[in-house]
Structure formats: structure tokens, C-alpha cells
Amino acid sequence: MGSFPCPQKIEQVLLSGQGLNELSFASRPACASMLVERVPHHGVVYGLGQETAVAQPNLPEGFDFTDPDVYAERIPYQEFAELRKTAPIWWNPQPPEIGGFHDDGYWVVSKLEDVKEVSRRSDVFSTHENTAIVRFADDIPRENIEMQRFILINKDAPEHTKLRKLVSRGFTPRAINSLREELTERAEKIVKEAAESGAGDFVTQVACELPLQAIAELLGVPQEDRLKVFDWSNQMTGYDDPELDIDPQAASMEILGYAYQMADERKKCPADDIVTTLIEADIDGNELSPEEFGFFVILLAVAGNETTRNAITHGMMAFLDHPDQWELYKKERPKTTADEIVRWATPVNSFQRTALEDTELGGVQIKKGQRVVMLYGSANFDEDAFENPEKFDIMRENNPHVGFGGTGAHFCLGANLARLEIDLIFNAIADHLPDISKLGDPRRLRSGWLNGIKEFQVDYKTASGGCPVRH
């Protein structure tokens, strides 16, 4: 492989990193009768010249399941429930000037089995065509969307198969287990340092730290550079939030440049990290191109950080809203906890596919070129798939959630790493901060697809008696 080029060669870089989370990661469901302003029952849905007779759900007029203003306030669990009950696969109209795709809307898929079917049928439902991201900035140039096809999650077979085979070498059970001791020590240190402050923002002091350290360890990022990488990743996912003073495109260029620099250094001095593994990878005569490597580092740095930290934050919020489960966790530490946290949190609300041909899904005709949005946040509360889905239950054994992106070729590459991080950080919190409590409501990220929390103020209340059980 030749030397890696300067990142300035990629002039139209992905706008704000909006194509992330193959590594992958509020309010709860409530009665649908709380809805006001209803859409009339038309009985006919139009899309790309298609007429399909389907049931019409009772939704607020003009409701858009990718509207970042909705998610800045809440997760629309009531609307999800209405879809599952009335129209599990429903055409959501959207003006062409909204979201960057210049079409007239998209299908929303709300039930677990239908979401899994879309995920499995990668020969029919493409991530490459319009990427997996459900909503971009309204004025994004088409070439910026197409640039995101370098990212693993936005590739179809056979390119996706080749790349996934290459990069999965860095996520073997052996590779993940090799991080356990280091991450255990990090988790303890993070929690103890937070405790010393007495009170503060759980997101920045606790939830952000362990995912950052885990990804940095995998990449071999020096300690002095880790906060810089963290800041870049934040900028690349906060593009839809006006409260954040960021430059997503500049951050994209910075992290690409950093990736190329790392690769050049490892070529000269190989190390025991994923960077060396990837730049030396050669399977069936193929290797990562410079662009593929750079965008994989973006995926790893951003998705591996953002989704897991939001899962941890939502997990802490769930425990504090359900104190019986926190007491149970402190005593039992069930291994089922991490997956229930991921189900409950659903760090990525939705991803999309695009139909490559006319097809059928759940009795609904989908036309070639139409987008299909998988509502993970709805599927994970499907009454037909989960017993008492509205209950946060860390002992839940039957838990076929899609918090790691469903099934099939794009199942979360870093799922086991995320589970490990969640397990380690909550063990440390239970040991050292068993009486933690919230001081205010969380501040949500404005995003059409990420279930992000920007701030969550807590009182750490350091325990005097220590953990109630021994480990």
C-alpha cells in the first residue's frame, strides 16, 4: 500500500460525519390517546406515482418521524405505538426540500420482525444508494451524501463483505478481551474522579469517558490526543443542534488527517493495535484503500464513542427512574443488564435503506428507489416481540432487540465491546456511587436519528459504607 494522501484530496467530505454507527448504540411509551391534531383517514398513500391502500394512523398533522425538533424534546413513543397498532408500514410524506434527498417521503417500518426483514434483505434494500442516514441538512449537496459511501455502513455487497472481513479482525473476542483489564481500571478511575466532584454532568464526567478510552486504546491514540479526537467526534454528530458552536466539515478533515498520520506512523513502526492490523490486512488480494481506512477511523471514533456513551447515560437515567431496578442491580449484577439498557436506550433511533427493485414488505408494495426507514426505537418496544416492553427489566432473558442495528450484514461490529463497557461502568458506579441521584432533567441533542443526551446533572453522593455485595 502506498503512502496515505493528505486529507485535502477529499474536498467534498461527509457533512458532519452523518453516516455513522456500524459500531454500534427519555420519555417512555404512553397512551396514544394523548395525541391531539389528527390526520384524517384517507385510506390511500401516494409515493413515487404509487397508490397503495393502507390504514392511516392517527398522528399529529404533518408529523415527520425524522424531524430533529421532535427528538430534541422527546422520543415519540406514543406515535410509534400508533403505527404499530394501525399501520406498521406507513408512507410518511416529506417535502422534497427537507432532509437532503429531494423525494416526496419515505416508508417507516415500526415492528420488530419487519425491521429485521429489511436488515436481512440487503440484496434488495441498499445502504449504498442513499446511505443509512435518514436525514441530512436540507441544503447538503448530493456529492456530500455520495462521499459517505466510503463509510462501511454505507456499502453493499460485495464491497461491504470485503471491508467487513478486513476490519472485523480488530474486533475478535481475543481483541476485545485484551482490553478488559485496562478498561476495568479506567472505569474505576472515572467513577472515583467523578465522586470527588460531589455533583456534576454525568455525560461528560462518566458516560463519555470509558467509550473514549476504549476506542483510543483500540486505535493506539496517545493519551494527550484523546480529548482532541473526542472533540472532533462530537462536532461530527452535532450538526443539527443550533446550541453547539461547531464546524463539522473542519472536524471531518481533522480526523481524516489524523487517521492518515497514524497509518503512516504504523507503516514505519508497527504496533499491537487495530491501525496496524488494518493497514497490514490483505485478504483475497485486497486491502483497504487510503480513503476506506480514513473513513473507517471516523466510523470507529464517532460511532463507537457516541452510541455507547448515550446508552450509558440512558441506562443511568433508567435506573434512577426505576429505583427498584437499581437496588436489584447493586445486589445481583445480572449479565442481562447491558442488553436491556441498549434496548431501552436505543442510541440510534433509526437508519434507512433504499429499495433496489419493486418489492413487498409486510403486505405493502415498495417501489424501486423509495426509502425505507427502520424505526429501531419503535421495534424495541413491540408488544408482539417483548413481554411488557414498557417495563425496564434488567432480568429480561428473551430480549431480541435491534439496538445494535438489527440483523444481517450490518449488525453492529462493536456490539461486544459496547456490552463490556456498559457492564464495567455500571459495576463501578454500583460499587462507588450506589446513592447517585439526579438533580435535573436531561438536555437532549437535536438530531433526526441519534437518541443523544447533551447534559445530565447528578449528585454523586459518595457512599460511606461501600458496595452492598462483594465481588
Curated annotation (Swiss-Prot):
Keyword rRNA-binding: no
Phenotype upon loss of function: Cells lacking this gene fail to grow in the presence of cholesterol.
Binding annotation for heme: C412
Essential cofactor(s): heme
Superkingdom field: Bacteria
GO biological process terms, semicolon-separated: cholesterol catabolic process
Record-listed E.C. numbers: 1.14.15.29
Induction context: By cholesterol.
GO molecular-function term, one example from the UniProt record: heme binding
Keywords: Cholesterol metabolism, Heme, Iron, Lipid degradation, Lipid metabolism, Metal-binding, Monooxygenase, NAD, Oxidoreductase, Steroid metabolism, Sterol metabolism
UniProt: substrate binding residues: G238
Record keyword Iron present: yes
Alphabetical list of InterPro entries matching this protein: Cyt_P450, Cyt_P450_B, Cyt_P450_sf
CDD domains, alphabetized: CYP142-like (cd11033)
Catalysed reaction, written as an equation: cholest-4-en-3-one + 6 reduced [2Fe-2S]-[ferredoxin] + 3 O2 + 5 H(+) = (25S)-3-oxocholest-4-en-26-oate + 6 oxidized [2Fe-2S]-[ferredoxin] + 4 H2O
Role played: Involved in the utilization of cholesterol as the sole carbon and energy source by degrading the side chain. Primarily catalyzes the sequential oxidation of the terminal methyl of cholest-4-en-3-one into (25S)-26-hydroxycholest-4-en-3-one (alcohol), (25S)-26-oxocholest-4-en-3-one (aldehyde), to finally yield the carboxylic acid (25S)-3-oxocholest-4-en-26-oate. Also able to sequentially oxidize cholesterol itself, not only cholest-4-en-3-one.
Family per similarity comment: Belongs to the cytochrome P450 family.
Annotated protein name in UniProt: Steroid C26-monooxygenase
